[in-house]
């Protein structure tokens, strides 16, 4: 029951697995928590990119605060489709432009946890290839029993990403994994994510 804040669902389990990863790479422990595919209480409209806190501030201080915000907000949001990834990716690109003003280099890891199939696959391919020189890697974690066949088209591990115009990626910018493949050893999810962060 994903609406029960007392019960750990796969989303929360994935977030907890990411806690160690965040601690290893982000000395500020700053996490931007964004939701998508939900009816926002303040507007009554479906949004495909919004702060989980339901405020104007998407940032959390550490994984525990991120999970707390998620559990507090989940009962207030009516989940809605279809599943679009590009708005979340676009928002991360905006964050990259802002962080580019900082004196130290910052690398972004966008983790998208989803239980639905993607409806903007072609646009995501195009945008990932277009922005492959940006300091960002994307990992999509599929939870549940949905048919995730489209998601594997975004996975760059075995072949280069290619869009409708035959443009191809030059690096491994995006990977897809199924949560159930790590269900017996969820800590391996964080280890897997480390493999897509450039050294």
Name what the model sees in each region.
Residues 1-199:
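Acidic, low-complexity intrinsically disordered regions
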């Amino acid at each position: 029951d994903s609406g029960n804040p007392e019960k750990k669902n796969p989303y929360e389990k994935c977030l907890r697995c990411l806690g160690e990863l965040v601690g290893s790479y982000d000395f500020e422990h700053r996490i931007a928590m964004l939701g998508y595919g939900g009816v926002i209480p303040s507007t009554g409209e479906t949004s495909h990119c919004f702060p989980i806190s339901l405020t104007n501030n998407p940032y959390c201080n550490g994984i525990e605060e991120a999970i707390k915000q998620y559990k507090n907000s989940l009962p207030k949001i009516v989940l809605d489709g279809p599943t679009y990834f590009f708005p979340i990716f676009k928002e991360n690109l905006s964050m990259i432009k802002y962080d580019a003003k900082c004196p130290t280099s910052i690398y972004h890891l966008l983790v998208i946890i989803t239980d639905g199939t993607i409806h903007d696959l072609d646009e995501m391919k195009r945008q990932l290839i277009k922005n492959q020189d940006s300091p960002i890697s994307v990992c999509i974690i599929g939870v549940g029993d949905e048919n995730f066949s489209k998601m594997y088209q975004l996975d760059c591990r075995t072949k280069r990403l290619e869009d409708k115009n035959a443009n191809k990626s030059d690096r491994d910018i995006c990977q897809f994994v199924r949560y159930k493949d790590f269900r017996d050893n969820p800590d391996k999810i964080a280890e897997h994510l480390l493999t897509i962060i450039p050294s």
